[in-house]
Amino acid sequence: MAKVQILNMVVLDNPCPFHNPFQFEITFECIEDLPDDLEWKIIYVGSAESEEYDQVLDSVLVGPVPAGRHMFVFQADAPNSSLIPESDAVGVTVVLITCTYRGQEFIRVGYYVNNEYSDPELRENPPLKPHFGQLQRNILASNPRVTRFHINWECASEAKMEDIENVDPASNAMLPPNCAPSKGLAAALNPIPENSMDCM
């Protein structure tokens, strides 16, 4: 069972100009004390065609985390527009908020993001070269996609002892569960986890 549950995530300052920071108010609960840090990341998917355009907008370590309910506002600068392919600047993309513990991602929250010109004339006749200063970002806050992954919450020595106690003497090796989600718009929101995905 996961030792951390996200209870709520609120998208702040939405909609807003493209260059405004991303802001998420995150409420989560720990069912017991965590001795190590949680690492939270905000990732902007720059193109559905290739994950090479993904930008980690910010990463923050939170911890050690005592048992109980916690809330913080996670803010990250807008993506570097020069790293976004011109053909992907306007339209729908994805922003991801991920959390890892001891290097293992255990939850991913994805939101669709629509970037469009606020000026109706620019919407009708978009320029060949995107004008990021004229774009408005609108996050579909009402429909986040939440994907959870099984991880090992114990430290290596505890996990090793547990494996030794639970190993089948006839087997040669324990194969830990592994889940390496792929990227892209649909893939970023719908990786193939080994347990569950739902809407918040």
UniProtKB/Swiss-Prot annotation:
One GO CC term on file: nucleus
Coiled coil: none
UniProt-listed Pfam families: ASF1_hist_chap
Domain of life: Eukaryota
Localization, UniProt: Nucleus
SUPFAM superfamilies: ASF1-like (SSF101546)
Keywords: Chaperone, Chromatin regulator, Nucleus, Transcription, Transcription regulation
GO BP of this protein: chromatin organization
Subunit structure: Interacts with histone H3 and histone H4.
Family: Belongs to the ASF1 family.
PANTHER family reported for this sequence: ANTI-SILENCING PROTEIN 1, HISTONE CHAPERONE ASF1B
Function (record text): Histone chaperone that facilitates histone deposition and histone exchange and removal during nucleosome assembly and disassembly.
Protein name in UniProt: Histone chaperone asf1b
Gene designation per UniProt: asf1b
